[in-house]
Regions:
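Short tyrosine-centred short linear motifs in exposed loops/low-complexity segments
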Residues: 110, 118-123, 210
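Short, acidic Ser/Thr/Gly-rich low-complexity loop/linker segments typical of extracellular
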Residues: 182-200
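Alpha-helical segments with a strong preference for the paired helices of cellulosomal dockerin domains
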Residues: 247-268, 277-298
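Structured interaction patches on ligand/partner-binding surfaces of diverse proteins
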Residues: 220-242
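Contiguous segments within soluble domain cores/interaction surfaces
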Residues: 20-111, 132-154, 167-169, 175-184
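Structural motif
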Residues: 159-174, 181-183, 248-253
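Short Pro-Gly-centered beta-turn/loop motif in secreted/extracellular proteins
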Residues: 196-212, 219
Length: 300
C-alpha cells in the first residue's frame, strides 16, 4: 500500500503541473518576451524518490483570443550547477552537455521538468529567441533575461538587491561573488550574475548555518562586507557597490587597473570599460585615478 501511495502522490503532482502554466511567451515592444508573471515567484521543488523535482508549464500569451506567437525557442543563458531541465527523455538545460536550447511545439504548450539532488537555491536564466508572430513575421530576440529561482529542501541562503549607482551599463554581464568566512578562513563561495528585476537580484544558498562574515564583490567594483551575520534559513542582505574602477577584479584599485584602461583606451573592450558606457575613454581613466589606492572591505 505504501508503494501505491507514492505512485498516487506522483500522479497528483503531475496532474497539477499539467493543469496550469507557469510563464507565458509573447511579444513586448517589438521583441520576444516572457509576458507573465513578473517577477517569477519562487518555485518550490518536491522531494520524490531521492530527487528534488519541479515541473514548469510554458505557453503562448493570448490577446483577443489569438496567441501572439506561432513559433519560439527558449535559450538557457545561465543555470546553476546541479540543476537539470528535461523535456520528455532529453535533458535540454544544464551547465554542461546539454543543448541549452529548445523549440516550442506547434500547439504552443510545453512542460519542462527540473531536477536536483541536493538542497539549495537554484537558478535558471532564459531568453526567448527565434520567434515568429501569429501573422508569420519574425520577432526580434528577447532583451535581457528572465530569471526563475528554485528552492530545494530547506537551505540556508542569502537574498536581496544589488545596486551599483555609478555603473552605466547592464549589471547582468558582471559577476556577483558572495563569500562566507569565519575568521581568516573562507567557508564557501557562490557566484552568479545579478538580475535586478527578478524576484531578488540574487539568491545564494550555503551548506551550513552559523555566524559569518559575509563579503560580496561585483565585477569592476570594490567588495562590501557584513560582520557577524547569523545565517539560518533565508536572510536578507542588500548590497550597494559604490566604489568603481577595479577592472582587473583583485579588489584593489592600483597600477594594474590603470594600465588596463590605458592599453584599451579608445576601444570598446568590455573588461576595461570601468563605467559600462560601452567605450574606454577619459571617464574610465578618471574613475580609476579618483579611486586610486582604494581597496575592498573584503581585503581588510
Amino acid at each position: 500500500m505504501r508503494n501505491w501511495s507514492w505512485i498516487v502522490g506522483l500522479l497528483v503532482i503531475v496532474a497539477a503541473a499539467e493543469a496550469h502554466w507557469d510563464f507565458l511567451l509573447g511579444v513586448q515592444n517589438g521583441h520576444a518576451a516572457v509576458i507573465l508573471p513578473h517577477p517569477q515567484p519562487l518555485q518550490n521543488m518536491s522531494l520524490l524518490f531521492g530527487q528534488y523535482i519541479r515541473e514548469l508549464g510554458i505557453e503562448y500569451y493570448y490577446e483577443n483570443g489569438r496567441p501572439q506567437l506561432s513559433a519560439a525557442s527558449v535559450q538557457t543563458v545561465w543555470i546553476s550547477p546541479g540543476l537539470i531541465g528535461r523535456i520528455g527523455s532529453t535533458d535540454v538545460a544544464c551547465q554542461s552537455g546539454c543543448p541549452n536550447y529548445f523549440t516550442m511545439p506547434e500547439d504552443g504548450h510545453l512542460h519542462i521538468r527540473f531536477r536536483a539532488t541536493q538542497p539549495g537555491i537554484y537558478i535558471w536564466d532564459l531568453r526567448v529567441v527565434d520567434a515568429i508572430d501569429i501573422d508569420g513575421n519574425p520577432v526580434q530576440d528577447m532583451e535581457g533575461v528572465y530569471r526563475i529561482y528554485f528552492k530545494a529542501g530547506n537551505p540556508h541562503y542569502l537574498y536581496g538587491s544589488v545596486d551599483a549607482p555609478n555603473y552605466q551599463g547592464d549589471l547582468y554581464p558582471l559577476n556577483l561573488t558572495v563569500q562566507i568566512r569565519q575568521g581568516s578562513q573562507t567557508v564557501q563561495t557562490v557566484s552568479m550574475p545579478p538580475v535586478p528585476n527578478a524576484l531578488h537580484a540574487y539568491m545564494a544558498s550555503f551548506e551550513q548555518a552559523g555566524s559569518y562574515t559575509v563579503v560580496a564583490k561585483l565585477d569592476k567594483h570594490l567588495s562590501r562586507r557584513v560582520d557577524n551575520l547569523n545565517l539560518s534559513g533565508g536572510v536578507q542582505a542588500d548590497w550597494q557597490f559604490l566604489v568603481i574602477g577595479d577592472v582587473n577584479n583583485d579588489d584593489l584599485i592600483d597600477d594594474a587597473d590603470l594600465l588596463m584602461v590605458l592599453f584599451a583606451f579608445g576601444t570598446n573592450e568590455f573588461a576595461a570599460d570601468a563605467n559600462g558606457d560601452g567605450i574606454v575613454d577619459d571617464a574610465d581613466l578618471l574613475l580609476v585615478l579618483f579611486n586610486f589606492g582604494a581597496s575592498g572591505e573584503g581585503r581588510d
